[in-house]
From Swiss-Prot:
It comes from Saccharomyces cerevisiae (strain ATCC 204508 / S288c). This is SAGA complex subunit NGG1. The modification Phosphothreonine is found at residue 464. It is found in: Nucleus. Keywords: Chromatin regulator, Nucleus, Phosphoprotein, Transcription, Transcription regulation. One of its GO terms (molecular function) is transcription coactivator activity. The lineage of its organism: Eukaryota, Fungi, Dikarya, Ascomycota, Saccharomycotina. Component of the 1.8 MDa SAGA (Spt-Ada-Gcn5 acetyltransferase) complex, which is composed of 19 subunits TRA1, SPT7, TAF5, NGG1/ADA3, SGF73, SPT20/ADA5, SPT8, TAF12, TAF6, HFI1/ADA1, UBP8, GCN5, ADA2, SPT3, SGF29, TAF10, TAF9, SGF11 and SUS1. The gene is NGG1.
Length: 702
């Protein structure tokens, strides 16, 4: 009879498939897989540890792991097939033993029936013989010898059958080793035998069930050489102890969670909001840094953010404007006016530097070429007296108001290139190449020594003849018309064609005064800041009171931002005042509650304090004992009454004042949303583009 392998082992004639690496057992394969993934097994906690636990390995590692898993699957499949064959062989042996027992029982029952019939026949003959009794005849020797021979023959036949079955089993195991379990003939044969022997083996069904249950659940029968099997031992032990088992229960629901964690109530919230923050997933086993910050320094930094509020904070919020200490008692300072005043211009750095040079060289003093004298900006003479020589000097100039208006309507600098390119195209003609013919004609026509190139680029000069000026004016009118049809800039004023106004010879001072009167009549030149040096004049201070420089523009922009920020801060402070008042009330409530808790702790300590034992005096021992017990009882009653009154006071304080506030964990928690959320949305809507609606309408119409 061949010896079958144990569970988890291959049959004797079969070997595991060998790999190139030499890892041909499951344990070696598992250890090599751990090395591939760079993992270690911590026996203390029963978990894996390594880099691959938190991050995904690279592709090369995963491919190597896949090959190892395939080989492990193949080896485990081979072992599983060997185990299945061993189990089927054991079933065959068990069935043969059961058949042998059944045959033996049948023979015993048949022999017993024959003996019973012979005994009944002898009894009947005795009765017929009228009470004549005779000893029972022993069975003949032939019968005894026949029964013995039959028993021996049956034993020999059973042994031969068992040997033949074992030989057939070995052959069938070799032939049907690669077949799945469902298609093997062993199961069908056992099923047929079971159906055939159902009627004959009914008394033995209970015994067979007991044997099957014992083989499947008893580790000593199924796996006799293993000391401990988890799948066979722990479930039965847990059921015997009445421990929790998830089988048969729903995986969701509060009752399931209560039974699983053995608690009276299970929270519906994960309590994440009560945590101080996200739990760090870091390794804190590294040594501390050498330049570690002191704890007192950290507390001093954090205290500004977590300290209790006070009345000073409320007073600060109720202040409309924050005024520096140096301006607190200055009555001339107005926080609504002074921050938005642009100071007057001081002396130019060129003047300051020139003055410093003159102070150093007092013997060689020179007049400053840069001066802030009002006479330098006043209108002088008229345009009729203007020539090329007067352009470099300041003897002829227009007033400050006219110069600003002219600068607002002058052409841009980039219009010069367009003017040059359009001049060389006449009525759809080709542009000139500027050859020798043009140069020769230019030289021949240059009778009055006029620079035509300069006149073409910068307009007519003061010495240009009248006919050339008229031609240039007509050309400018056509150019303006073409540019107006194609779209020009807003800073150019196209000239009208068909009429020419007769110029009035006005000097610049007169023209400046007429311009002021017209602007006042329209309502523009009004409510201007007065000149402090000349209060009787209606004109502003054009020298030091100008606000058209870059610094003044930047100051105006910053002042506009200051107005918006001041308005926003006032709204936010008004919204914070009720919140701070509520927080101050909560702080007062908490401080009183803490005082009550301290008093209760002190009273409880006095109540449970054991009095010191005094030395006994033998003379008046009885009197001292009586007085001691009475005083202790009185003190105990007083302590109990004071503790009870404190507890009642604390309970009344919590029940009466506590409902005015939210829960303590909510009052101490940092809010999840900003208290200015709605205000910020309103400000964003106010700062939106006012032309957005019109633009959308135009888009819809188009």
């Amino acid at each position: 009879m061949p010896r079958h392998g144990r569970r988890g082992k291959l049959p004797k004639g079969e070997k595991l498939p060998k790999k190139e690496g030499g890892d041909n057992t499951p344990s070696k394969l598992l250890s090599s897989m751990l090395k591939t993934l760079d993992l270690t097994f911590e026996r203390d906690i029963g978990m894996l540890n390594g880099k691959s636990v938190r991050s995904i390995p690279n592709k090369k590692t995963l491919l190597e792991l896949q090959s190892q898993l395939d080989s492990l699957n193949e080896i485990l499949g081979t072992i599983a097939r060997g185990d299945q064959e061993t189990i089927e062989a054991l079933r065959k042996i068990r069935d043969s033993k059961n058949e042998k027992q059944a045959n033996d029982e049948k023979q015993e029952t048949s022999n017993a029936d024959g003996q019973h019939e012979s005994s009944t026949a002898t009894e009947e003959t005795n009765i017929i013989d009228k009470g004549v009794q005779s000893p029972p005849k022993p069975p003949p020797s032939n019968e005894i010898s026949g029964t013995i021979e039959n028993d021996v023959e049956s034993i020999k036949q059973a042994a031969d059958n068992m040997a033949k079955e074992e030989i057939n089993e070995d052959k069938d195991l070799q032939v049907h080793r690669d077949q799945p379990r469902e298609k093997r003939p062993f199961d069908s044969e056992t099923e047929n035998r079971a159906t055939e022997n159902e009627n004959t083996q009914r008394p033995d069904n209970k015994k067979q069930k007991i044997d099957v249950d014992k083989m499947e659940n008893d580790p000593t029968v199924k796996n006799p050489k293993s000391e401990f099997v988890v799948s066979q031992t722990l479930p039965r032990a847990a059921a015997a102890l009445g421990l929790f088992n998830e089988e048969g229960l729903e995986s969701t629901g509060e009752d399931f969670l209560k039974k699983k964690y053995n608690v009276a109530s299970y929270p519906t919230n994960d309590l994440k909001d009560l945590l101080p923050g996200e739990l760090p997933d870091m390794d804190f086993s590294h040594p501390k840094p050498t330049n570690q910050i002191q704890f007192n320094t950290f507390l001093a930094f954090v205290e500004n953010f977590f300290k209790d509020l006070s009345d000073d904070n409320l007073k600060f919020l109720k202040m409309k404007y924050i005024i520096p200490d140096s301006l607190q008692f200055d009555k001339t300072y107005d926080p609504e006016v002074n921050p938005f005043i642009i100071p007057k211009l001081g002396p130019l750095y060129t003047d300051v530097w020139f003055k410093d040079e003159n102070d150093k060289n007092s013997a060689y003093k020179k007049p400053s070429p840069y001066s802030n004298d009002a006479s330098t900006i006043l209108p002088k003479k008229s345009a009729n007296e203007l020539d090329d020589n007067a352009l470099e000097s300041g003897s002829i100039s227009c007033g400050p108001l006219l110069s600003r208006l002219l600068s607002a309507v002058l052409k841009d600098d980039n219009d010069k290139s367009e003017l040059q390119s359009s001049k060389i195209i006449r009525d759809g003609g080709l542009p000139r190449t500027g050859g020798e013919d043009d140069i020769q004609s230019f030289r021949n026509n240059n009778n009055d020594t006029v620079d035509m190139t300069l006149s073409q680029e910068n307009g007519p000069s003061v010495q240009t003849p009248d006919n050339d000026i008229d031609e240039e004016a007509s050309f400018q009118a056509k150019l303006a018309e073409n540019k107006g049809s194609n779209g020009g800039t807003t800073s150019t004023l196209p000239q009208q064609i068909g009429w020419i106004t007769n110029g009035i010879n006005l000097d610049y001072p007169t023209f400046e005064e007429r311009l002021k009167r017209e602007l006042k009549y329209v309502g523009i030149y009004m409510n201007l800041p007065k000149d402090e040096n000349n209060p009787n004049s209606d004109d502003p201070d054009w020298v030091t009171g100008r606000e058209d420089d870059e610094i003044s523009a930047e100051l105006r922009e910053l002042q506009g931002t200051l107005k918006q920020v001041t308005k926003k801060n006032q709204k936010r402070k008004a919204q914070l005042i009720p919140l701070v008042e509520r927080q101050l009330a909560w702080q007062e409530y908490s401080s009183i509650l803490e005082d009550l808790d301290k008093q209760i702790d002190q009273a409880y300590v006095k109540r449970i304090r054991v009095p010191k034992k005094r030395k006994k005096h033998h003379t008046a021992a009885s009197n001292n004992v009586n007085t001691g017990t009475t005083s202790q009882i009185a003190q105990q009653k007083a302590a109990n009454s004071s503790l009870k009154s404190l507890l009642d006071k604390r309970q009344r304080w919590i029940n009466k004042i506590g409902p005015l506030f939210d829960k303590p964990e909510i009052m101490k928690r940092i809010p999840n949303e900003s208290v200015f959320k709605d205000m910020d949305q309103e400000e964003d809507e106010d700062e939106a583009d006012v032309f957005a609606q019109n633009t959308n309408k135009d888009v819809e119409l188009n």
